Amino acid sequence: MTTTRFAPSPTGHIHVGNLRTALMNYLIARKAGGTFILRLDDTDRERSKQEYADGIQRDLEWLGLTWDRIERQSDRLDRYAEAAEGLRAAGRLYEVFETPTELDLKRKKQLNMGKPPVYDRAGLKLSAEDKDRLRAEGRAGYWRFLLDQERIEWADGILGDISIDAASVSDPVLIRADGQVLYTFASSVDDAEMGVTHIVRGADHVTNTATQIQIIRALGSEPPAFAHHSLLTGAQGEELSKRLGTLSIRDLRESGVAPEALLSLMARLGSSQPVELKMSLDELAEGFDLGQFGASPTKFDAEDLWPLTREANQSRPLAEVRDRIAALGVPDELVERFWRVASQNITKLDDLAGWWQIFSTGAEPQIDPEDADFIAEAMKLLPPPPYTDATWGEFTNAVKQATGRKGKGLFMPLRKALTGQAHGPDMSEVMPLLQVVRARG
């Protein structure tokens, strides 16, 4: 069975880059009828917060990205300890003691000699006596994974065939001196034991993937199929990472972006397929194809979300917004008409409040000086509310007869006086919604 996972660290709010990863993994699982796991990588005890874990789940639920099971790495520490013991027994974990300063000096020396800055495996040469002496000096050992120095190859679902020489990569640190397991190790253990079959993540993880393939094999499992999507840039190609805090899913939700708009854009961004609004995840899954995605950096512009949001909200059935409309105070008998009229003239659902304010308390009349006398005369011909579907036609005919005006010179000033806007819904539909007309005085 196809099994994918989204594994965020609950150290902050998830952003559009995280969503792209989550969505790709979700769609792969759904298209195959498989399992989608939400795994909270919360082994960083200092930075992981429950409020962020709750926020991640809230964001995914808002988007409809429901998970089949949820896992927390903090609940699996015993499994990592057992796996580490197995690797030690197999000679694949070795203890090292270098300080960050010593490692930095080694790197600089290697670079000055024209060599790649790869860890020199000095820890392998330490005797038991050496280690005891270092501990007596107050040093705490940490643990590296011994890579087989061979080429690590895989068929990447997006990047194609990848080959990395393990000799050019430092043996990764898997366990810190305080015993905390690091991402590379915990993730490998989880992916192996949870039966993850496909992993899609950012191209900045390619080197991690090479080392994790060896770790997973050392654990006695076969690695999953990997794919690495391009990284996002800003609209002008600028680095986006510094701005991701302002592009959190929470902030986009609160700004009024429709979930369908965000999903539709992120499911196609960076692919050869055109971005089209899809109102369901089933539709997105049906057309999803990793083979359509390219390796080049992908431009993301938040402004692209607004036309899609407008389209999504305009096509939304009344049943989805009835409670929201009722909460505005719209009478039951006007709810259907109000949605029919307002839905085609909003971008965000929050815009509905502005339209109901116009209809319920009256708009501030917009009257050009040259139209003041015309409007004053016209308003004498408009009876007080309530109005019907016929009111607009009857009213404008009466004004036309009384003033001789016609066409735009007739309709535009009247619209601006009644609604405070030069453009908007069909006035014959608007009139029955008007509770107050300020222009009547």
From Swiss-Prot:
InterPro entries: aa-tRNA-synth_I_cd-bd, aa-tRNA-synth_I_codon-bd_sub2, aa-tRNA-synth_I_CS, aa_tRNA-synth_I_cd-bd_sf, Glu-tRNA-ligase_bac/mito, Glu/Gln-tRNA-synth, Glu/Gln-tRNA-synth_Ib_cat-dom, GluQ/Sye. Its EC number is 6.1.1.17. Disulfide bonds: none annotated. Its main location: cytoplasm. GO terms for molecular function: ATP binding; glutamate-tRNA ligase activity; tRNA binding. A motif ('HIGH' region) lies at residues 8-18. Transmembrane segments: none annotated. A motif ('KMSKS' region) lies at residues 239-243. The keyword Transport does not apply. GO terms for biological process: glutamyl-tRNA aminoacylation. ATP binds at K242. Keywords: Aminoacyl-tRNA synthetase, ATP-binding, Cytoplasm, Ligase, Nucleotide-binding, Protein biosynthesis. It is found in: Cytoplasm. GO terms for cellular component: cytoplasm. The keyword Nucleotide-binding applies. It is an enzyme of class 6 (ligase). Monomer. Belongs to the class-I aminoacyl-tRNA synthetase family. Glutamate--tRNA ligase type 1 subfamily. Catalyzes the attachment of glutamate to tRNA(Glu) in a two-step reaction: glutamate is first activated by ATP to form Glu-AMP and then transferred to the acceptor end of tRNA(Glu). HAMAP family: Glu_tRNA_synth_type1. This is Glutamate--tRNA ligase 1. It comes from Paracoccus denitrificans (strain Pd 1222). The lineage of its organism: Bacteria, Pseudomonadati, Pseudomonadota, Alphaproteobacteria, Rhodobacterales.
